[in-house]
Amino acid sequence: MKLESAIQNELDFITNTIKANTEPESIYLFGSYANGAPNTDSDIDIYVVVPDSENDTIELCAKINFDLAKRRTLPIDLLIGKKSIFENRKNRLTLEKIIANEGIKIYG
């Protein structure tokens, strides 16, 4: 799927910011931007899969959001999940299943 250059630039910034804070297994874009139906109220929905060895995903999410706030131009909804949890939940009726099936893997 081809995204607008402004959105692609934002995704590049998001990906680089995440990679500066952790070593993600993968990063997914999901929601309205992934579905090709964003509107003026849409945020950028991002799900980051991190290694199981990542100790504190809540603190990591706060740190990444802080770093993203320095330059982002659109609102971002950032979720972080450990790899084993993502792998386990992507086969059930969960958000992870929607992300795995309908999201766009932008890294990993």
Residue ranges of model-derived segments:
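Catalytic core of pol beta-like nucleotidyltransferases
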Residues: 1-26, 35-40, 51-108
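Glycine-rich beta-strand-to-loop/alpha-helix junction loops that act as flexible
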Residues: 30-32
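Short beta-strand->loop micro-motif that forms the acidic, two-metal-ion catalytic signature
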Residues: 45-49
